[in-house]
Amino acid sequence: MSKAPVNIVDRPLSKGKGEINISSFAFLFSEMIQYCQDRIKAGHELEKKLSDMGYSIGPRLLELLCVREKNSKRETKLLGILSFIHTTVWKSLFGKPADSLEKSTEADDEYMISDNNMVVNKFISLPKHLSSLNCAAFVAGIIEGILCSAEFPARVTAHNVAVEGKRFPKTVILIKFNPEVIERNA
């Protein structure tokens, strides 16, 4: 007697890694960019649109990861949520932790997560008038959605930073927390 296939709705959330083929992701992501590009007038609007798409994913991803984690408690400390994003979220999204997590030396409310090889910027070729576009705005939106739903409101942006001796720039996700978050964690 063979087992009947399990309906996707009946599968437990705690199982499965949910890995997808990189070429499938690249195709889907390039179609998202094309979709957004057809509906904008200026380049900065495209980053905003990508960020908004990512923002809607953030709370759902946070819930899923909290259910899948063995000791599924929500983080209440600033460094705890940043470490969670740097390791757990990044591993879930990209299969590896981010390359670095740093506190800004210029502002107490700013933190940076760096990735030397951001997959969302890897397979994208842009026209000249959009050459300054950073497709990692999508990832920044996901991070902002996670932080806001975890009660750490922040403004999250993505930036390209040139690295000496490297052909491609690294991506820095800049997280600027609202003042009440810094006061609460002081």
Curated annotation (Swiss-Prot):
Question: Signal peptide: which range, if any?
Answer: none
Question: What InterPro entries has UniProt attached to this entry?
Answer: NO_sig/Golgi_transp_ligand-bd, TRAPP-I_su5, TRAPP_component
**What UniProt keywords are attached to this protein's entry?**
Endoplasmic reticulum, ER-Golgi transport, Golgi apparatus, Transport
What are the transmembrane regions?
A: none
Any one GO cellular component localisation term in the record: endoplasmic reticulum
Q: Where in the cell is it found?
A: Golgi apparatus, cis-Golgi network; Endoplasmic reticulum
User: SUPFAM superfamilies, alphabetically?
Assistant: Ligand-binding domain in the NO signalling and Golgi transport (SSF111126)
Give me the disulphide-bonded residues: none
GO BP, one annotated term: endoplasmic reticulum to Golgi vesicle-mediated transport
Query: Principal place where this protein is found?
Result: Golgi
The protein's job, in short, is: May play a role in vesicular transport from endoplasmic reticulum to Golgi.
Family membership: Belongs to the TRAPP small subunits family. BET3 subfamily.
The record's annotation in PANTHER family points to:
41-2 PROTEIN ANTIGEN-RELATED, TRAFFICKING PROTEIN PARTICLE COMPLEX SUBUNIT 5
Binding partners and assembly:
Part of the multisubunit TRAPP (transport protein particle) complex.
This chain belongs to the protein called Trafficking protein particle complex subunit 5
Higher taxonomy: Eukaryota, Amoebozoa, Evosea, Eumycetozoa, Dictyostelia
What is the primary gene name for this protein? trappc5
